[in-house]
Amino acid sequence: MSKLDLNALNDLPKVDRVLALAEPNAQLETLTAEERVAWALENLPGEYVLSSSFGIQAAVSLHLVNQIRPDIPVILTDTGYLFPETYQFIDELTDKLKLNLKVYRAGESPAWQEARYGKLWEQGVEGIEKYNEINKVEPMNRALKELKAQTWFAGLRREQSGSRAHLPVLAIQRGVFKVLPIIDWDNRTVYQYLQKHGLKYHPLWDQGYLSVGDTHTTRKWEPGMAEEETRFFGLKRECGLHEG
């Protein structure tokens, strides 16, 4: 089949876009993660990019996509508030997997933001959303534009939260195709992939963290907590990158 026409799909109402992607999604559900990446490279337009927060399971999608598409730009939106272990993990994986890392940050430094707005993450949902818009959404939008992305790979999984439970393999977000190759993987499959390829979880996994973001909005998992409750004080699951 010829490559899907992104411009034509973007001209459709959202409901019609979903319907137009129903047939490809039905096919993609039957494929392996590796086959989904190969399908996307064959049927979706470039440029291609991969985003990563370098979180708990980040090594999976970074390894999987990069081995099929070496040198694919890997977008990291750096808030300046990541854990020291995360920055060390970024360096380790970038070296080990020979990643083409592209780091994007807000126009205002963390210190300047705090001077202007206070600690936004302590200001309820509205504060968190403003923080995410400044530090996550705007830098990602800039990255997609500067890298001329038309197809965006990400490592989301349905098992991670209720907000991700019904996501399709293929969608259109921020005006580009978005592909989620490991969307249907469970924790066991993630573990098996890491073991098979000699990869590691994020260093904080061993300290009881199920999900890792910024230091000020990430909590260790405790018995009785859902994974999504370990982020943003349980007020939100998404940082804004995967919404909209």
Curated annotation (Swiss-Prot):
Active-site residue list: 239 (nucleophile)
Catalysed reactions, semicolon-separated: [thioredoxin]-disulfide + sulfite + adenosine 3',5'-bisphosphate + 2 H(+) = [thioredoxin]-dithiol + 3'-phosphoadenylyl sulfate
Example of a GO biological process term: sulfate assimilation, phosphoadenylyl sulfate reduction by phosphoadenylyl-sulfate reductase (thioredoxin)
EC identifiers of the protein: 1.8.4.8
GO molecular function: phosphoadenylyl-sulfate reductase (thioredoxin) activity
Any one GO cellular component localisation term in the record: cytoplasm
Keywords: Cytoplasm, Oxidoreductase
Compartments it resides in: Cytoplasm
Listed pathway(s): Sulfur metabolism; hydrogen sulfide biosynthesis; sulfite from sulfate: step 3/3
Domain of life: Bacteria
Ranges that cross the membrane: none
Principal location class: cytoplasm
Enzyme class: oxidoreductase
Record-linked Gene3D superfamilies: HUPs
Xref: NCBIfam families: cysH (TIGR00434), PAPS_reductase (TIGR02057), PRK02090.1 (NF002537)
Classification via HAMAP family: CysH (MF_00063)
Family from the record: Belongs to the PAPS reductase family. CysH subfamily.
Function: Catalyzes the formation of sulfite from phosphoadenosine 5'-phosphosulfate (PAPS) using thioredoxin as an electron donor.
Protein name as catalogued: Phosphoadenosine 5'-phosphosulfate reductase
UniProt organism field: Salmonella agona (strain SL483)
